A protein has these predicted regions:
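N-terminal membrane-targeting hydrophobic helices
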Residues: 1-165
């Protein structure tokens, strides 16, 4: 995914908002947590460009591992449920890490993701984007999958505009 992580986070927040309306988290904090979580795994791009000099695919870094986010999500969610839905920090961690899992799932659509790292060193991807154009990002923008990203953005925009009316 190239441009749809933040809009996908917004869609996720809209879908979950009614379910968690009774919690003591403000709507602003609720949306902020999920939308930050939806883009957070890509902070490894700073390391990728500034220190690693693009020598290792940034999806190999631990912030793009299911094995990193899934235990955080499950432990926080179990604690939230065990607290009879009152542990606000557990809910916040669940929302953030759940959105990070969404990010990784979206990346798997057309980008290599090492789903089982660090245990298995193999990338997985649903659809390959072949390298035909320079610069490299044109390969993604001119691929049919970019339409899916635009669709996600459009759905998020419709939900946002619909909220204001």
């Amino acid at each position: 995914m190239f441009i749809a992580h933040l809009p996908a986070g917004y869609i996720l927040a809209k879908l979950l908002l009614k379910k968690f309306k009774q919690t003591k988290i403000t709507n602003k904090a609720f949306f902020t947590l999920i939308m930050l979580g939806a883009v957070f795994p890509d902070i490894d791009l700073f390391y990728f460009y500034l220190f690693d000099h693009r020598s290792v695919h940034h999806h190999k870094y631990f912030l793009h591992w299911f094995s990193f986010w899934l235990p955080i999500f499950l432990i926080a969610l179990c604690y939230f449920i065990h607290s009879k839905y009152t542990a606000k920090p557990a809910l916040m961690i669940s929302l953030f890490s759940g959105a990070a899992l969404l990010h990784i799932g979206l990346d798997t659509f057309v980008g290599d993701v090492w789903l089982f790292a660090p245990f298995i060193d193999q990338p997985y991807v649903f659809f390959e984007v072949s390298s035909r154009y320079q610069p490299w990002w044109l390969n993604f923008i001119l691929h049919w999958s970019f339409f899916v990203e635009l669709l996600i953005c459009l759905i998020a925009l419709i939900l946002l505009v619909g909220k204001k009316n």
